[in-house]
Amino acid sequence: MGTRLRALLGVLILLVLGGAGWLFLRWEPTLLPIRLIQIEGEVHHHSSQQLQERLTERLHGGILTADLVDLKQTAEELPWVGQATLRRVWPDTLRVQVREYRPIARWSLDGLVTADGIVFRPQGGSIPSNLPLLEGDDKRAPEITARYQAWQAALERVGRGIQRLSVDPRGDWRLKLASGAELRLGTTMVEERLARYLASASQLEAAGRPLTVDLRYSNGFSVKWAPNTDTGVRAHPDRVAARAGNRR
């Protein structure tokens, strides 16, 4: 067989293979379609049907040619979906493992935040009103969330709980407890100031119903009491407790 003939046969083989490949890609969705999208994992806020519909709209190709990277991104665009893992299951199934975000608190006006400080905003979804509220810059979410969890655990040990935790752009920290009392921690030494409150929490509650506990002093705090607090226990509605030093 001459060199020219071998070259011609090589070209013909490449054309045949190329044509076959083109035909396969063209007809593969028909010959090997994805007939079932199987959702696994805990899907509380987006039903399996809703996620299936989103993936079906985005699906192009069959079991061999479907773009799993694109489908993964589509699944993770749903606000509650933290991570999606997709794999092909022969002959006609796409299996999707879903891990949803699990919020521990509301975040500012329209968001939720996870224990890791990941902020997400369900578009058109309901925000659970029974969760505590955290407020601050999104960039500080990991720090705020970590402090919320640590402080909540410490407060629970003295029978208290956090309803709202906020930090403003100046770094001024405030806590509102489930009892209605507000703690002013200021911008510095916030851990020490909270510890000061914890050490006196029982005595404060025994003395009356504090509305505001201002801990922004170098040594001590001031208390604003509820109007109906027993006047026999205290001398003045704005009595200062263990106050010393300048407020910061």
Swiss-Prot record:
Location relative to the cell: Cell inner membrane
Q: Which residues lie on this side of the membrane: Periplasmic?
A: 26-248
> GO:BP terms for this protein?
cell septum assembly; FtsZ-dependent cytokinesis; intracellular signal transduction; lipid metabolic process
Q: What topology does the record note for this protein and the membrane?
A: Single-pass type II membrane protein
The membrane spanning regions, by residue number, are 5-25
Q: Where is the signal peptide?
A: none
Instruction: Describe its function.
Output: Essential cell division protein. May link together the upstream cell division proteins, which are predominantly cytoplasmic, with the downstream cell division proteins, which are predominantly periplasmic. May control correct divisome assembly.
Q: Which residues form the POTRA domain?
A: 32-101
Q: What PANTHER family does the record tag this protein with?
A: CELL DIVISION PROTEIN FTSQ
Q: Which residues form a coiled coil?
A: none
Q: What is this protein called?
A: Cell division protein FtsQ
Which family is this protein grouped under?
Belongs to the FtsQ/DivIB family. FtsQ subfamily.
- Pfam families given for it? FtsQ_DivIB_C, POTRA_1
State which gene encodes it: ftsQ
